[in-house]
Amino acid sequence: MSVDPAHRRQQGRQAPPPPFDAELAGPLDKILADLPMPLTPALVPDRRRRSLAGRLTDEQIRRGGTFETEERTVPGPPGAPPVTLTICRPTAATGPVPVVYHTHGGGMVAGSHRSTELAGELDRAQELDLAVVSVDYRLAPEHPDPAPVEDCYAGLCWLAEHAADEGFDPRRIVLSGNSAGGALAAGLALLTRDRSGPRPAGQLLQFPMLDDRCDTFSAGQMEQVGLWDGLSNRAGWQALLGDRRATPDVSPYAAPARAADVAGLAPAFIEAGSVEALRDDALAYAARIWEAGGEAELHVWSGAFHSFDEWVPDAVVSRAAHHARVAWLRRILDR
């Protein structure tokens, strides 16, 4: 007998959340004291100001000469403005290098191609001698679906077409995103499959927003708990989709959990914290990929909140998450 999804969310509301990791609990309290939750439309300007203030500079990206960086403006989707890419090349590269195509987070409403999470991509790139290309897509609610994912697709197509000229290996492009960026990376994997576009080598989905219906047990359990709680998640989806949210009229390229077919996708790395609203969406998406005969590696970090490693990078669990991502990337790119 099936369980009504709304009932599962209600059950979650009545359940206590899992405990936070001891190294994360104190920092989270300080974060939430400064960063009001849940997200509301009135808070979007504040989130954008914070993101702008935290943008990485060229000097921070170069890391003392480890990378060279440039901004590139490339054609956008048909009839839409051009798309800006930040290109980060390892200066010591001697041949075509693999490249991570980064779609930033920000709940669909904030963030940029130079947001602080780009530092995590550069950490992994520095360890593995990779390039990173980060795309600046249009933001909701001013630019609702499909603008964000189409911008990202336009950037991906340019990257694949010009990879050899840029010193990149077009056969080893990995899609990577955090939170809203995880939704876009997963949506891109579906979109490029269905359009017979560039074929990525993998998709690295960190704490991804996958389902606009927000009807899981964890969505209720963490409705007002932690960073990017269930109420914030609904607000982000509402900004992207408007009145279409939680209706049948939602594209899988916007909300990948809506995909009827997840076969034939690039290998996936999917992760979530045990104390975040998006946890059960990550579990369900990995399970569907396995059921379709696909390849997915799933991690649920015990006691962790949304994007914990960006905020508390020196915690033991944060270092474990970093090592897991690096190990997965190494395996995928060595094939």
Predicted region positions:
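Gly/Ser-rich "nucleophile elbow"/oxyanion-hole loop immediately N-terminal to the catalytic nucleophile
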Residues: E161-L175, R195
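Hydrolase active-site cap/lid region
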Residues: L190-P248
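A glycine/proline-hinged amphipathic helix-loop "lid/cap" segment
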Residues: M1-I87, D334-R335
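Alpha/beta-hydrolase active-site loop
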Residues: H143-D165, R325
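Short amphipathic alpha-helix adjacent to the substrate-entry channel of hydrolases
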Residues: R114-V133
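Short beta-strand element of the alpha/beta-hydrolase
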Residues: P96-G106
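Catalytic active-site module of serine/aspartate enzymes centered on a nucleophile-bearing elbow/loop
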Residues: P313-R335
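Short beta-strand/loop motif that positions the catalytic acidic residue
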Residues: I270-A272
